[in-house]
Structure formats: C-alpha cells, structure tokens
Amino acid sequence: MQEISIKFKLTNEEINAIENQKKYYEDFRAISIEALKIVQKKRGWVSDQAIYAIAEILHINPSDVEGVATFYSQIFRKPVGRNIIRYCDSVVCFLTGYKRIQIALENYLKIKIGETTKDDRFTLLPVCCLGNCDKGPTIMINEDTYSVLTPESIPSLLESYK
C-alpha cells in the first residue's frame, strides 16, 4: 500500500463512533475491525485514505489496519453495488449444486465473480461458508439468506432487489 498524500477526513460521526470504541479495548489495534465497519457502513467501502485516517485515530500503523481489512472478506476495499450477493462455494454447497446457482447468477447479471453490474445494482462475491450447510446451496443478498435454490428461482429473487 502506498502512502497517500491527499488529505482525507473522516466525518465527525465516524470519528466519534471510533473514539467511542476505545473505552472497550486496551490495545487499540483490536478496534480496527470495528473502525473499518463504521467507515464502510457510512461509505459502502474502505479506501486507502480511510485506512490511513483510521490508523491515525487509533495511533497504530496503517499496515495493521490494512492487514485486518484484507483478511476479512466482509470489508470491501473497492466500491461495490447497492446489493451484495454472496454465494457459498464450500464443499457442502458444491455437493448440493452451488455451481448451477453461480452460473445462473452470472448469466442473469451478466457479470463474473468479483464484478459489479453496470448499473451498480449488484456485486457478486463467493464466500467459503454461510453456515447453512444443511440447506444448500445458499446465497445471501445483503443480510437476507436464501437456501435450497434452483437456477430457475434466481431471476424472480433478484428482481425483488432494486
């Protein structure tokens, strides 16, 4: 990660929320995941500039914040669509047919894994497990979980998300 020379500012709301977390932790590095979630909730993703701003508030090295951001798949390091589709690509969902669901999603959305639709409506991401192994294949759209899917069910499901 290159050092960013452009001055970037978090909002007062973001700063206050991050500062509020300090009372719960002795080691401020432990706050980095919460700080990343605070920034992402407001902005939709976490830029390099935000990484440096978080590190400054927490008085830690930016590489520590970057390490946390890149480790957690729920932290987005580039802009994403309004609706995040996560499909489970675990062994169990493989056995229950996730590949057919993945293909149906890609065909309907006209994007590949990791891409966002041209209208910024959807981003398609694989995840290792959604914890719904007895009901696979499973996807999540934002915070909503859908199980026992068929390729034919994908169009009507996606149409309900604007």
Curated annotation (Swiss-Prot):
Keywords (A to Z) from UniProt: 2Fe-2S, Iron, Iron-sulfur, Metal-binding, NAD, Quinone, Translocase
TM helices/strands, residue ranges: none
Record GO terms (molecular function): 2 iron, 2 sulfur cluster binding; metal ion binding; NADH dehydrogenase activity; quinone binding
The protein's required cofactors: [2Fe-2S] cluster
Cofactor: binding details: Binds 1 [2Fe-2S] cluster.
E.C. code: 7.1.1.-
Enzyme class: translocase
Chain residues that bind [2Fe-2S] cluster: C88, C93, C129, C133
CDD domains: TRX_Fd_NuoE (cd03064)
Catalytic activity field: a quinone + NADH + 5 H(+)(in) = a quinol + NAD(+) + 4 H(+)(out)
Pfam families named among the record's database cross-references: 2Fe-2S_thioredx
Keyword Metal-binding: yes
Function according to Swiss-Prot or TrEMBL: NDH-1 shuttles electrons from NADH, via FMN and iron-sulfur (Fe-S) centers, to quinones in the respiratory chain. Couples the redox reaction to proton translocation (for every two electrons transferred, four hydrogen ions are translocated across the cytoplasmic membrane), and thus conserves the redox energy in a proton gradient.
Protein family: Belongs to the complex I 24 kDa subunit family.
Subunit structure: Composed of 13 different subunits. Subunits NuoCD, E, F, and G constitute the peripheral sector of the complex.
Listed name of the protein: NADH-quinone oxidoreductase subunit E
